[in-house]
A protein has these predicted regions:
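Residues at the starts of beta-strands that form the adenosine-phosphate
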Residues: 32-33, 64, 117
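Conserved beta-strand segments of the P-loop GTPase G domain that flank and frequently precede/overlap
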Residues: 36-39, 68, 96-97
Length: 159
């Protein structure tokens, strides 16, 4: 009984809180700040590996990065990030490493982000992402670190 109510409230929250900021593809040379969402609830994987990789590679490029890596305790009843963990305003790139469209925290963070360019690993309803880099293998088989490296290669090709 709780699940349908929660899903209804999630849809309402997405509709109410969704960002209306325009988004488009940006070359990496135009990116000055980024937010990387690492799925802290992914099973069988250490999210710290992807978080460290994202911090290191963006720092090497001179891009300010904030890594969001929420555990279950960092989410509210609906599955949204707690206010203290929220995505900052005014970022250029939002990158989600969540492999499943069922990860509501990633979908909500992406939808509400005011980033000028959004990229992710799976297609979400309403076309939230400007760029989707899906694994050629079965969904979710790549680690988040492997997915980050692959997405970064695509981002480097955008002129």
């Amino acid at each position: 009984m709780i699940r349908p109510i929660r899903n209804l409230l999630r849809r309402q929250a997405l509709r109410r809180d969704r960002s209306t900021a325009p988004t488009s593809l940006l070359p990496m040379s135009a990116v000055r700040s980024a937010v990387v969402f690492v799925d802290g609830t992914a099973e069988g994987e250490d999210p710290a590996v992807a978080a460290r990789l994202a911090q290191r590679l963006f720092a090497d490029r001179g891009i300010d990065v904030q890594v969001l890596c929420p555990a279950k305790r960092d989410l509210d009843w609906l599955g949204r990030l707690n206010a203290a963990q929220g995505s900052p305003a005014g970022v250029d790139l939002f990158l989600s490493l969540a492999a499943s469209p069922d990860c509501f925290a990633a979908a909500y963070a992406a939808a509400c982000s005011t980033a000028r360019f959004k990229a992710g690993r799976c297609t979400l309803p309403d076309g939230i992402y400007d760029l989707v880099v899906a694994s050629p293998r079965q969904e979710g088989t790549d680690s988040q670190a492997e997915a980050f490296t692959a997405i970064l290669e695509y981002l480097d090709k955008i002129q």
